[in-house]
Structure formats: structure tokens, C-alpha cells
Amino acid sequence: MEAIDTLPSTELENRWARVRKYLAADLPAVQGVMVMSRTLIFWLTGHWGNGLFWLPMEGEPVLMLRKGLERAKLESPVESILPFRSPGQVPKILAEMGQVVPTVVGVDMGNISWAAGQALTSRLEHMQFVSADQALARARAVKTQWELATLRLAGERHSQSLIEKVTEMIEPGMSERDIAKAVWTAMYDLGHQGQIRMNGPGEELYLGVVAAGDSGNYPTVTNGPVGYRGAHPGVPQMGYAGQIWQKNQPLIVDTVFQLEGYHTDKTQVYFGGQSRNVPEELKNAHTMCQEIHSWLADNLRPGAKPSELYSQCLDMVQKQGWENGFMGLGQNQVPFVGHGIGIYVDDWPALAAKFDTPLEEDMVLALEPKIGIPGQGMVGVENTFQVTSQGGVSLTGEAEDILCL
């Protein structure tokens, strides 16, 4: 048997080197990092592992698995892939490999359960565990050329689905649910692989959000600006079968495209009628979002501080009098205007206050200025960008206008 795909060993070595670099800078006392999140194990090994990955500051990494050993050996270039049942076996495994058994260890604390954390501390009592979340986030924020190639392809297909395919499949009179089905069909036909992964504890996402008319301001429980009814209180995703997209109403579609474990984020606003019928308030609000989106893209350069970019956006909004609906209406309002994206949709850094670490070349962020209009809905723009010295380069196309159908 052969693997469907494998990461080059040089790609993994590059990622390991970046993790070690940020561990050394942020946590000089640690002797390595234990990663238990399956998504991060995939990022560090090329295999969506059920177990634990040990990356020492010096020496050979080890992938320890409860299940899937044969598959891991097909998929991952990691040389040491071993079976294990419990974290308590880690010292013996490392000692048998001739490695130093660590006493200070970084852990991906933000991505594991309380029970998993307790298992570490109770079975490895001699070890001191510290959070390596920030070092891991910084390491994965700067994308490799391999990652960028995957994200570009995802972005191209994302744009094609919303701009070319969906426009031929939807029309006023359809329910949000039927529109969501059309969007899903378009994206899946273009290679979307279904799974969407979130970094925030307990957060879930399936496809994204479809909100017709004032659904765009419906109370939301997720950390995003777009309101939506969703399919049901138990599944607050996609769109509601009972909400119909009416003529001369806006429709906002905020979706994620996933390809080979990497995500792009894009929002497209449609209008159920001719452009001359778009209400002036919606036009003006959307133009404001386009101006912010364009300014952010121009300034998405190495050295720029996310907190300062966010502050400037707030100034632009306040000067035009849109502060009450910017990034959500009422309690839907969120305190950011963009976010990192890659193996997670909601990754570091956020374009928000207190995020003062300067951007670096080849970071990838979604920029999403949006404005809610009482009684009408939400408008705005979102694309996924690569940080370059010339400014942000869109990976999800250049379309920003409201598409009138």
C-alpha cells in the first residue's frame, strides 16, 4: 500500500526548526515540546496521529501512537514512529532511544482536554509542564512555500466557487438552507474536503454562514461579526430553511474552503435585484468596508503591528460614522478586523488591540471588515492574504463588489 500523499522531510525539518527557534526565545528552560492535538501532530509529522509527538530541542523527534502505526509509517517522514498506550511510558521510550528524559517540557495546553492534561501531570510527576502555545502559534503563522502553494490553490477554488459557480445556482426566493446546499455543492465539486478545523476551544464550523436580509444581524454565539439563524439551535451553522432570500435583499455568504488540511476564508455579498435597487445605506456601508479592506491589504507588510492596523481601521470607521455597526451590530460586535489562518480557521495573530508582535513575510491572514445595518442585513468584504514586502497579496481573488443577481 502507498500513502495518498506525504510531506517532504525537508518541509518537516523546516517546521521543527521554527518551533525550536520560538521555544528557545520564549521558553529557554524547556527541553522540548510534547504535542497531543491531532491537528498539530499532523502539522509536525504529516500524519493525523492518535497519540503524542515529542520534539526535543536537540535530538531525534519521536511520534508515539495508540493506533494507526502502519498508516503513520506510510504517511510520515518521521523516522521514529513507535507504539505506546499511556504518557507514563514516555520516559522509558526516550531512555531506550538514548535520549535524555526531560524535566521541563512545553505542551500544547490550549488544544488538549483537562483530562489529557491531568494524565500528563499524574503519570509524569517528575516533569514540569509549561504552555508552548505561543511558540507553536508563532512558528506556524509564517507559512512555508509548500504551505503557500496549497493555500493558493484553495483560494483560487474558493473564489471560483463563490464568484462563478454559486451565481449560477442561487436566486431570490430560495431559502437559506437551499442556498447553503448550493454553496456546499459548488465548493465540494471544486475539491473542498469537508472538514473545517477551529483553534478556539469548543468552537465548531461547518461550511460557514448564509444569512439573507436581517438574518445578518440575528444574535450570534460565535466569535465573528455576521449574525445568522443557522439550521437549528443545536446546529447554529449554515442557513435556516424557514428564512427566504427576498427580492431587493442583501445576502451575505461567509465560508471557509479546506484543501489538504489548509483553510481560506472569504465572504461574498449578493443582492436579489438590479444594482440600481441596492439601498443607498447598504451601498455606502459596503464602500466603507471596501476602503478598509483595501487599506489593510496595502499595509499588510512585514513590520506592521496588528494592533496599530486595527486602531487605524477604527479611526476610519469613526470618521465616517459607522462605528455602531462595524464588525457586528449591537452585541454581535467583535473586537477585531482580521485573523491568522492556515491549519486552523481562527489562528494567530488577530488584527486586534494588544496584538503588538509585528507581522512577518509570508504570514497569511483573513481581512474581514463588515458592517451591520439595522433592519436590512450585513455587508462587507473578506479575503485571505499573504503578507509581502509589497503589501498583502490576495489568495482568494480580487472581487469585492456586491454581486447583483
Which residues does each PLM region occupy?
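Active-site neighborhoods and metal-handling regions in enzymes and metal-associated proteins
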Residues: M1-L405
